């Protein structure tokens, strides 16, 4: 069997690079003409950066494609090269970002992502420059909530580096791993790979100047949270919970993580989501389905502000499902509620910055 470069390139054209959703040839990742010596083939693939989370899987796919489309007898050597300048050191990332706000919850299903999306949009409505990072690598929801599931971020060349350009909607710059993986496919990554992808979304993106960088974190306390704490100086954390005691118990754990002596991230306040239900036909009535004022009592116990009590409202749920969060409708009752929340966050952030030094990044050394 005689091998020739075009044959190799045709095989590589069947491999899709997840970073662009194009094949390796269309993505211009073939650095040079494949080198052939008998049944030995050398391919040089050019990746945007050495931290690319898709590097190993793409290399394996390229090798498998050559074996499948040409012959298993081909001895394949794949060399990787990188075209970006080194990313900034930890501690020097995102120097143009003024405030980094982590929106957290101890338990899933309390509406944390809904709060994150609406808070980011409300801050933008107030005139601030806002970025929103969906840090839930295994369960991203922001593309759906913003109605941008079909969008794909592209790369821009800036300061000697190829950077991901965030998707922008409702005045908010947005990135999520959901833009790079299929919405119907589970992300089966170990913690290290997930954290590497998260770092790429932070350090290898063109976030530009931001007044507020909102981090929609996954529930609980995990590798993702630790990576954020080791990568960014977090101005403060906002804790979201329902009034239910089982949710409040996990909210305490989230607060404890940020208040740990090695972390010391200020708690900006608590948000009580699903605080009560008011039927449209009985607007004066409040039904406390999940308990009454649980977050208010916890906030008092922890000596932190209660930033908002958000009721169960059908339009809030529908807005997230339809890609038009409630905060986009500034004239509605729910839109005004999220504007009020945003104003409260601005107030506590300004107070925190006036009274406390910037948060130190958690050391990676024991």
Each language-model region and where it sits:
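C-terminal accessory "lid"/substrate-recognition subdomains
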Residues: 288-314, 331-336, 340-366
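Extreme N-terminal, non-catalytic leader segments
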Residues: 26-29, 36-37, 41-104, 342, ...
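C-terminal boundary of histidine-terminating zinc-finger modules
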Residues: 322-332
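Walker A/P-loop phosphate-binding motif and the immediately C-terminal alpha-helix
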Residues: 100-136, 263, 270
